Amino acid sequence: MEPNNVERNLQSLRRLYSLLVANARNEYIPEAYKLDDNTQFLLKRLLDFASHEHFVTQSNLLATQLRVFPKTVLHGAKPSNVADSSETTPPAMLSQINGSHITRVSKPLEAKGTLQRDLRVDQIRSNPSKDVLTEEVVDAIEQIDTQLSALSFVSSRVDSDERTRSVKSFVTPPTEECRQNSQASMPCLRSNYMTVSQKSVISGAEVTFPYNDQLVRVTSPPQPLPPRAVSGFKKPNQSNRASQKMPIMKPTLMDQETETFDDDSSETEADQTPSATGSESEDEEVSTSQEYSGETGSSSGSEWETQAENDTESKSESSYPPQNDDSVSEVSTSPPHTDRDTSREPGKQRRNVMGRFKRIKNKIGQIFHHHHHHHHHHHHHDKEKPSAWNKLQSKFHHKHQEKSKERKRPMSESKGLTTHKQQHQGGHFHALVEGLVRHRKHSKKQKHQLKSDAKKTEWWKLLKKRQGGGVKIPKRGRVKLGKKKHYLSKNV
């Protein structure tokens, strides 16, 4: 029997038991589902038989799912109020449980053609109390709930086990295949650490790899080989050159091995690997000079070197043909856009070249007004080039630049009429039209009366009229009133 069918049957039994409890407790039930006492006892008996049979079937099913085959029948799953199957089951439907399946054996009926009396019937008749019936039904419902929960738990566990088993079988290869893959990968790992001569000996034996190789091989990079086994060097990748400083590798003689140190970044460069013959070293030198010549524009800014390093390299380069200047990135105190080679210049000219930190100090001084820009230096043309420094200076100095332009105007322009910039010349026509309209509008107004031609009296005459003929003046020789000089006598 399938687990789904067992679960459905157990749920049906639970519904019937709940209906029986509702009738025994005289709860509200529709008229069609009401049962009398005899029907209740008979239904209780039938449900006990059916539940016992389903419990046994479920125990065998759970044992099969968990891959446990019990040799004995689980008596704990049988209800307490149900007698043994040999006593309660009719002879015609007697069932025998063998391991994980149920075989039904029909016994011949008795000669009289009647069934044996069931002991369960006597038990029910001897104890017809409804209280006992209700308790037994409640216990049966609890057992059914327990069986349902156990069935759901086991089914979910079996599903999860099958899911994990399928994932493992898909991802993990068999042990034999893993062993073969590991054995096949060993020659490949050994060949990475072999010299060229040893690889040529083993080249006849080819290693075959399986097509469906599911193992991920993580191999560490090969360690540096001894100098005698290396015939050349590889070109560094562009991404590595842009991210960090790469050592400048040059072929040297068999007896010479030089090490150069970067003073600015305190990074030790790799040992120089000698070439096998002189002809191979010359060919490699020409090829590397051609490869580096087109890429110094992007990597010159990140691969600067000090002057002391250039001096040590110039000594080691004396026994080799000259290389292109672009093939080696050298430190210059000027920014990366300058292409001058300061190592070729005499000592006096190198002293006059402004250092990088000094140039930064001058620019910061120009921004914060404690240092003035001197135009006699050779870098006075920096303002013409667009740069972030010039934009930053323009934000700080835009007001001062306008004042300096006003000071440079000629004297005739400043003393004459006020002049405006070319960009503020608009608006003359509009002003002319507004003046004409205003004149036309006020021309119709009544004009003021013309003033009389009579001469205006002076203020001192008005004072004489108001004060009755004269003004009291202290005794002085001469008093100036208005525009005339009056000589006063003592009689006044």
UniProtKB/Swiss-Prot annotation:
It comes from the Eukaryota. Transcripts of KPL and ARI14, encoded by adjacent genes organized in a reverse orientation, have the potential to generate natural cis-antisense siRNAs (cis-nat-siRNAs) pair targeting ARI14 in sperm, thus leading to opposite expression levels during male gametophyte development. Mostly expressed in pollen and open flowers and, to a lower extent, in closed flowers. Residues 337-348, 403-412 have a biased composition (Basic and acidic residues). Keywords: Developmental protein, Fertilization. Disruption phenotype: Altered male gametophytic development with frequent single-fertilization events leading to reduced seed set due to undeveloped ovules. Increased levels of ARI14 in sperm. Residues 287-305 have a biased composition (Low complexity). Residues 317-336 have a biased composition (Polar residues). This is Protein KOKOPELLI. Residues 218-354, 394-426 are annotated as: Disordered. Positively regulates reproductive function by facilitating male gametophyte formation and double fertilization. The keyword Transmembrane helix does not apply. GO terms for biological process: double fertilization forming a zygote and endosperm; pollen development. Residues 256-270 have a biased composition (Acidic residues). It comes from Arabidopsis thaliana (Mouse-ear cress). The gene is KPL.
